């Protein structure tokens, strides 16, 4: 029996050592599916390397003696092999598959499903503002990658859900919805800078916070905004209050997280991701 037990114990020790050596960031954030995050090891370097995915710069952080790229994977990404570029070299990584459920919503305001021509002009202007914010890339290192919940409350709608409004399919749900009362304070989940404040056709009152290197939080449908563009925020500071402005059926807190201009599942950053 001891002779049989020794190899088994050695194998267990090897597996435990391998797990322990895995990066904490990798273990926590690496969810490489459409709408998820890939953590790619860039190796050691004297200073922070730069990397790009789909031509866009990605967040790079150091952990122990190596640099890691934290790559946002868009919902439109096909499963298979994707490629990160770092200077002249390319780094492949695998993207798995994930099936997202459907959600059917009935809206009384038909214009919020099929906007009128004047609405469409407004929507186009507002979209251009928001795209510019999502593509912001400041040099700062995020204060924390494991984020705080902006509010305490149950989830009412998950990320990636295929949405049908009055029977017509529209864009997938690009964030998390929390079922909390109107007026609930919304707190920034990490240090950041307010880069955009607006009152939009679909999103209602909205705030974008840049946490550094394309790591962006967006909060919308707010009843009140308590910050201004350019304001620097510390983790836990209030950005505004929960509401139901824009295309909303009732009060809730909607939170988007974006990496390299890809909307990704905020649940990954609060330990609530479900494969």
Predicted regions and their residues:
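Positively charged n-region of N-terminal signal peptides that target proteins for export
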Residues: 1-6
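Bacterial N-terminal signal peptides
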Residues: 7-17
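Cationic-aromatic interfacial patches
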Residues: 22-99
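Surface-exposed, glycine-biased beta-strand/turn segments
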Residues: 26, 92-203
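Intrinsically disordered, low-complexity acidic/polar segments
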Residues: 49, 60, 78-80, 102, ...
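Short, charged, solvent-exposed linker or helix-capping segments at domain edges/interfaces
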Residues: 53, 103-106, 267-268
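Catalytic cores of peptidoglycan-degrading enzymes
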Residues: 148-275
């Amino acid at each position: 029996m001891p002779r049989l037990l020794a190899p088994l114990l050695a194998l267990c020790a090897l597996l435990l050592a391998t797990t322990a050596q895995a990066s904490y960031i990798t273990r926590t954030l690496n969810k490489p599916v459409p709408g998820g995050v890939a953590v790619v090891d860039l190796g050691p370097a004297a200073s922070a390397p730069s990397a790009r995915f789909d031509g866009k710069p990605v967040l790079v952080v150091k952990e122990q003696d190596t640099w890691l790229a934290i790559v946002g994977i868009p919902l439109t990404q096909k499963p298979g092999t994707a490629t990160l570029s770092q200077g002249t070299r390319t780094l492949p990584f695998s993207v798995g598959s994930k099936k997202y459920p459907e959600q059917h919503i009935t809206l009384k305001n038909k214009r919020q499903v099929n906007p009128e021509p004047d609405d469409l002009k407004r929507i186009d202007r507002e979209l251009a503002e928001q795209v510019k914010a999502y593509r912001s890339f400041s040099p700062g290192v995020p204060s924390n990658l494991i984020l705080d919940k902006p509010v305490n409350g149950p989830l009412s709608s998950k990320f990636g859900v295929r949405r049908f409004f009055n029977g017509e399919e529209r864009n997938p749900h690009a964030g998390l919805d929390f079922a909390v009362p109107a007026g609930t304070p919304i707190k920034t989940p990490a240090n950041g800078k307010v880069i955009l404040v607006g009152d939009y056709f679909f999103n209602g009152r909205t705030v974008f916070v840049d946490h550094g290197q394309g790591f962006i939080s967006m909060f919308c449908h707010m009843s009140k905004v308590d910050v201004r563009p350019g304001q620097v925020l510390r983790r836990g500071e209030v950005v505004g209050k929960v509401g139901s402005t824009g295309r909303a059926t009732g009060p809730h807190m909607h939170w988007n997280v974006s990496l390299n201009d890809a909307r990704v599942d905020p649940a990954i950053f609060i330990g609530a991701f479900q494969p």
